[in-house]
């Protein structure tokens, strides 16, 4: 039976039970009693066995502890012996030092007889007398300065001391206040300087923003002008090709009529009803020039060199006329886009460069003879008609 199993109940039988109970009940109770006794015996044996093992273990532990304590005792005895030895050595050293420090009579006599030590003692005695004299003099002066409350010198001296103390306090206040005022002034200057720096920084920022806006406007106008210039050059090249083809194939009367009609339309669009006469003059002049050009067309048909000169001169005139028609557009865009007049300088520079290029390109053409003159008249008539058509577009 283990410790976890419960013990059976104890059976109690009286003499009356033996007399009254039947045999079967008595046997049953006897069996229960036997089981109870058996359980007790088992428990007793278990306890005995556990006690024996526990005693053995405790005995072993006690033996180990005894051995450990014996070892410690030996160690402590050894330490005690070493300590006693050290103590004996220390006592010996102390006695030796005492003997050394206690001079003998012979040593004392030798030190007193030594002249150097005697001189040292004499000097010490003289210094002691001087200090005593100084102390006595200081005490006499202190007693002399002592005065009664009724003495006039004491009152004057105290008043003077109070006045000096007040003056010192006032001087300290003035110095501190002057320093504070100086610091406040410096602080105000620094604040003013910082405000000026901030205002200048704000102005610079505004100026930079304005410059950025102007640059953006200039870039936009430049892009528009470049696009217009590109478109105008393309249109002029197309018109030049068409005019060359029509000049080679059609008679001189048809270009005259076309020039007149296009000149009339251009005059109506550009000048309005009031400038009709000027538009008619332009058409007549362009027609006359075109007639002169048609008369000289047969002369230049055989030579490829003259054709190259004619094309070069036509390119010069088209670039010149294209720039003359682009300038009004650029001025219109400048008046709308740019907040300032900074773009006007750009357009004037472009006009100056165009005029310089025209003058440089006209120099080699001016010395070519009568054929170049007639080709120039022809090209003037063609350019006038092309300009009229471009203005209509």
Swiss-Prot record:
Cell compartment(s), UniProt: Nucleus speckle; Nucleus, Nucleoplasm
Region (Disordered): 242-393
GO CC annotations, alphabetized: cytoplasm; nuclear speck; nucleus; RNA N6-methyladenosine methyltransferase complex
Keyword Nucleus: yes
A Gene Ontology biological process term: mRNA modification
Keywords: Cell cycle, Developmental protein, mRNA processing, mRNA splicing, Nucleus
Matching InterPro entries: WTAP
Basic and acidic residues: compositionally biased ranges: 254-267, 354-365
Compositionally biased residues, Polar residues: 272-286, 321-353, 369-393
Pfam families: Wtap
Entry annotated with the keyword Glycoprotein: no
Function: Associated component of the WMM complex, a complex that mediates N6-methyladenosine (m6A) methylation of RNAs, a modification that plays a role in the efficiency of mRNA splicing and RNA processing.
Subunit structure and binding partners: Component of the WMM complex, a N6-methyltransferase complex composed of a catalytic subcomplex, named MAC, and of an associated subcomplex, named MACOM. Component of the MACOM subcomplex.
Family: Belongs to the fl(2)d family.
Protein's recorded name: Pre-mRNA-splicing regulator WTAP
Lineage: Eukaryota, Metazoa, Chordata, Craniata, Vertebrata
Protein encoded by which gene: wtap
């Amino acid at each position: 039976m283990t410790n976890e199993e419960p013990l059976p109940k104890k059976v109690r039988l009286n003499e009356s039970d033996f007399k009254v109970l039947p045999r079967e009940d008595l046997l049953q109770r006897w069996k229960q009693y036997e089981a109870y006794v058996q359980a007790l015996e088992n428990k007793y044996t278990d306890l005995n066995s556990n006690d024996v093992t526990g005693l053995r273990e405790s005995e072993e532990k006690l033996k180990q502890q005894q051995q450990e304590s014996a070892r410690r005792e030996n160690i402590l005895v050894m330490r005690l012996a070493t300590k006693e030895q050290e103590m004996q050595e220390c006592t010996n050293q102390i006695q030796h030092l005492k003997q050394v420090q206690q001079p003998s009579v012979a040593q004392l006599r030798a030190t007193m007889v030594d002249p150097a030590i005697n001189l040292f003692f004499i000097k010490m005695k003289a210094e002691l007398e001087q200090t005593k004299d100084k102390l006595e003099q200081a005490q006499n002066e202190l007693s002399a300065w002592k005065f009664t409350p009724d003495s006039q010198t004491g009152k004057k001296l105290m008043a003077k001391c109070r006045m000096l103390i007040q003056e010192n306090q006032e001087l300290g206040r003035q110095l501190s206040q002057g320093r504070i005022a100086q610091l406040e002034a410096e602080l105000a200057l620094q604040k003013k300087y910082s405000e000026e720096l901030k205002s200048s920084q704000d102005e610079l920022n505004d100026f930079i923003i304005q410059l950025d806006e102007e640059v953006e406007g200039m870039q936009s106008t430049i892009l528009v002008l470049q696009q217009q210039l590109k478109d105008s050059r393309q249109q002029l090249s197309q018109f030049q090709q068409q005019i060359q083809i029509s000049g080679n194939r059609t008679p001189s009367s048809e270009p005259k009529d076309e020039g007149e009609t296009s000149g009339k339309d251009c005059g109506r669009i550009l000048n309005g009803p009031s400038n009709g006469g000027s538009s008619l003059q332009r058409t007549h002049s362009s027609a006359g020039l075109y007639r002169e050009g048609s008369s000289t067309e047969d002369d230049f048909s055989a030579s490829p060199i003259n054709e190259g000169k004619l094309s070069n001169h036509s390119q010069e005139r088209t670039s010149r006329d294209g720039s003359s028609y682009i300038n009004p557009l650029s001025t219109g865009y400048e008046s709308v886009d740019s907040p300032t007049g900074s773009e006007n300088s750009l357009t004037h520079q472009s006009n100056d460069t165009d005029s310089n290029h025209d003058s440089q390109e006209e120099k080699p053409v001016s010395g070519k003879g009568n054929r170049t003159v007639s080709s120039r008249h022809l090209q003037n008539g063609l350019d006038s008609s092309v300009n009229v058509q471009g203005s209509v577009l």
